[in-house]
Design a protein with these regions (language model features):
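N-terminal catalytic scaffold of extracellular/periplasmic and nuclease hydrolases
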Residues: 21-135
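General helical structural elements
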Residues: 6-7, 62
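Positively charged n-region of N-terminal signal peptides that target proteins for export
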Residues: 1-5
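Bacterial N-terminal signal peptides
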Residues: 7-15
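Sec/Tat signal peptide C-region and signal peptidase I cleavage site
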Residues: 16-20
Length: 135
């Protein structure tokens, strides 16, 4: 009986080892300091990033990237707000809705998330389909 138990334990360990050899790749993407950049930077702006940025480009990149890399985590490091009239008019709602559509997994807060006060920040967090984390 003891031999059968040891044999079963060894077989279990062998099967566990065999299954552990299958590796997966996890990709972590993050955005940071997007500052309400819903539209691309004006093509004619005196800016090295003129014509770049914007939610449509980001969403397209993420869709294409996830097609080729199914195991992706997407985070934002804060400061999604402040910087354009979108934030001044809608107080972060546009930004959070876009992040929901792009499938963010989590975000943390930056200093500009406090710009319209704690009540507004709490409202945005309730709208988010992802956790807002901070240490």
């Amino acid at each position: 009986m003891k031999r059968i138990s040891i044999y079963c334990l060894l077989m279990f360990c062998a099967l566990l080892t065999a299954s552990a050899q299958q590796t997966k790749q996890l990709v972590i993407l993050h955005t940071s300091d997007t500052h309400s950049r819903i539209e691309p930077i004006d093509l004619h702006a005196a800016d090295p990033y003129a014509g770049a940025g914007g939610v449509v480009r980001r969403a397209t990149f993420l869709k294409d990237f996830r097609t080729k890399n199914p195991d992706v985590l997407l985070f934002d490091c804060g400061d999604i707000s402040q910087g354009t009239p979108y934030y001044n008019l809608f107080r972060g709602e546009v930004e959070v809705r876009m992040m929901n559509l792009m499938g963010y997994d989590a975000m943390t807060i930056g200093n500009h998330e406090f710009d319209f006060g704690l009540d507004n920040m709490a409202r945005l967090f309730r709208m988010a389909h992802f956790p807002v984390v901070c240490a």
